[in-house]
Every structure is written in structure tokens, then in C-alpha cells.
Amino acid sequence: MEALVYTFLLVGTLGIIFFAIFFREPPKVPSKGKK
């Protein structure tokens, strides 16, 4: 069960860091209607 907790913490931390970077500097991606 510890593996599940560690995975959850890892995903949570990565998500927070990703959001922090995204909100810190606006995404300048020249992708208009391209995904």
C-alpha cells in the first residue's frame, strides 16, 4: 500500500510544479487549432 501513497504524492507534486510553472509564465505556444 505504500507504493500507492508514494505514487500519489509524486503525481501531486509534479502536478503542483507544472501548474506553478504554467501560471508563472504564460504559455507562448504558436499552436492555433493544432493539437
UniProtKB/Swiss-Prot annotation:
GO biological process, alphabetically ordered: photosynthesis
Signal peptide range in chain numbering: none
Primary subcellular site in the record, as a coarse category: plastid
Localization terms from the record: Plastid, Chloroplast thylakoid membrane
One Pfam family matching this protein: PsbT
Keywords attached to this entry: Chloroplast, Membrane, Photosynthesis, Photosystem II, Plastid, Thylakoid, Transmembrane, Transmembrane helix
The keyword S-adenosyl-L-methionine belongs to this UniProt entry's keyword annotation: no
One cellular-component annotation, GO: chloroplast thylakoid membrane
Transmembrane stretches, start-end: 3-23
Membrane-related topology note: Single-pass membrane protein
InterPro entries the UniProt entry points to: PSII_PsbT (IPR001743), PSII_PsbT_sf (IPR037268)
Protein family membership: Belongs to the PsbT family.
PANTHER family membership: PHOTOSYSTEM II REACTION CENTER PROTEIN T, PTHR36411
Quaternary structure (record): PSII is composed of 1 copy each of membrane proteins PsbA, PsbB, PsbC, PsbD, PsbE, PsbF, PsbH, PsbI, PsbJ, PsbK, PsbL, PsbM, PsbT, PsbY, PsbZ, Psb30/Ycf12, at least 3 peripheral proteins of the oxygen-evolving complex and a large number of cofactors. It forms dimeric complexes.
Biological role: Found at the monomer-monomer interface of the photosystem II (PS II) dimer, plays a role in assembly and dimerization of PSII. PSII is a light-driven water plastoquinone oxidoreductase, using light energy to abstract electrons from H(2)O, generating a proton gradient subsequently used for ATP formation.
Name this polypeptide is given: Photosystem II reaction center protein T
Gene encoding the protein: psbT
